[in-house]
Amino acid sequence: MASTSVAAAEVKAQTTQAEEPVKVVRHQEVGHKSLLQSDALYQYILETSVYPREPEPMKELPRVTAKHPWNLMTTSADEGQFLGLLLKLINAKNTMEIGVYTGYSLLSTALALPDDGKILAMDINRENYDIGLPIIEKAGVAHKIDFREGPALPVLDELLKNEDMHGSFDFVFVDRDKDNYLNYHKRLIDLVKVGGLIAYDNTLWNGSVVAPPDAPLRKYVRYYRDFVMELNKALAVDPRIEISQIPVLDGVTLCRRVY
């Protein structure tokens, strides 16, 4: 979701034998370029372990999203696979997603949850969500989704007023406005249950977190970099959570609430 690393277009993969013809393979058409140093290694992961197991609705949604001018904001196939498996491992049932875009990560979550599972999904743009909604409906999982259009902070504040909502969420995925990540964390830590997970996307922010101050960065990358770095520092010392920062795509930090 709201994620702005460089989109990987369809490219020609070189074969190991120089005399063999160049073969066109499927690359991550939309989404983020991997932080792996080798594009060939990333492509190997996709072709070997991700695409063969990707459900048909999740193959279709990127094709539809590719027509959108901001298609690079979508979650990638390998991250979607990672999230789906993670949800099953923790037996998640009640989840939340902040930042939906066209719904790739949302669809991955919905497919992973049991039939009576629920997702509170929030995004400021309903039009983007409507692009993927027909595919979500066709997949038979739309009934699991409670979509709210608008800023997430007022919704979170309203939830916090209800004591019954404290500790009620098994899993939260955050992939929206990076300048509000810390504001989200201050609220989500009370809404997720002890033992539950919060996943923050883009915590390596296109690798810019290690770029020198005078590095030539895109304007939006430079603007949000400081907010991402501030979040990373805060999560690293928060005693209420255990964390693991994983270099999946643009970086995902998992936070497990311990008290």
From Swiss-Prot:
Molecular function as annotated in GO: caffeoyl-CoA O-methyltransferase activity; metal ion binding
Alphabetical UniProt keywords: Lignin biosynthesis, Metal-binding, Methyltransferase, S-adenosyl-L-methionine, Transferase
Parts forming coiled coils: none
InterPro entries according to UniProt: Cation-dep_OMT, SAM-dependent_MTases_sf, SAM_O-MeTrfase
Cofactor remark from the record: Binds 1 divalent metal cation per subunit.
Pathway(s): Aromatic compound metabolism; phenylpropanoid biosynthesis
Pfam family for this entry, one: Methyltransf_3
UniProt-listed Enzyme Commission number(s): 2.1.1.104
Cofactor(s) recorded in Swiss-Prot or TrEMBL: a divalent metal cation
Protein's name according to its UniProt entry: Caffeoyl-CoA O-methyltransferase
Family indicated by similarity: Belongs to the class I-like SAM-binding methyltransferase superfamily. Cation-dependent O-methyltransferase family. CCoAMT subfamily.
Function: Methylates caffeoyl-CoA to feruloyl-CoA and 5-hydroxyferuloyl-CoA to sinapoyl-CoA. Plays a role in the synthesis of feruloylated polysaccharides. Involved in the reinforcement of the plant cell wall. Also involved in the responding to wounding or pathogen challenge by the increased formation of cell wall-bound ferulic acid polymers.
Keyword S-adenosyl-L-methionine in annotation: yes
Residues holding S-adenosyl-L-methionine: T75, E97, G99, V100, S105, D123, A152, D177
Source organism (scientific name): Pinus taeda
